[in-house]
């Protein structure tokens, strides 16, 4: 399946990377990027691997680390990465 990054996903991903670089160093940020890319490749092959959120069955939440997840929308031919989320925040409702 084709992976598409939404504008929000690009912005929130970059914000997480900058936060990690500033607070934990470049190596931690690089590990986060690698883990994210790996998760996205797995999702491309197995789009329904992660749990669907309650109200929208086509939107799923993939956990990258205990502090960060990303939400993605599974469509017929594409997967849209919607945004990255700091798990320390209150969950969002769709």
Describe these PLM feature segments:
Residues 68-69, 73-94:
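Enriched for short, Lys/Arg-rich terminal
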């Amino acid at each position: 399946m084709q992976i598409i990054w939404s504008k929000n996903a690009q912005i929130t991903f970059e914000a997480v990377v900058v936060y990690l670089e500033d607070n934990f160093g470049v190596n931690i940020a690089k590990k986060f990027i690698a883990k994210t890319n790996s998760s996205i490749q797995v999702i491309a092959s197995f789009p329904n691997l992660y749990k669907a959120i309650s109200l929208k069955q086509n939107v799923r939440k993939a956990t990258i680390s205990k502090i960060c997840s990303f939400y993605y929308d599974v469509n017929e031919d594409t997967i849209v990465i919607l945004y990255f989320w700091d798990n320390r925040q209150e969950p969002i409702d769709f």
